[in-house]
């Protein structure tokens, strides 16, 4: 969906706390039920990137195809300005509001910038793990940020 076609519908599509959206197509074509979640824009007067949060009601567990509760991306010309660090800090209270005692955030082992963002928010490395097929790389790092140990 393009913003210009229907701005209100586009904005509504960023917020799906009841998982009413269409199923999600995984690499390989398998369709799976959408999880509740929402996406925020990171903004400093201009668009900087997005950060999203998803969860499975009643549990901290995620389906195998969901690598973490939170994902983020910053446009290249806005990197190294603390935007992702602030964005992650800002979204954590919303994670705590759905009752999670911790969130999981994953990254590539060689993505030192994302590792720094996660660690700056209290992330603790819990494992290196093999990614499911279809993700285009072999290994990932899984961090947990605990509600009671959040550092931002």
PLM feature spans:
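GNAT-family acyltransferases
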Residues: 1-76, 94, 126, 131-152
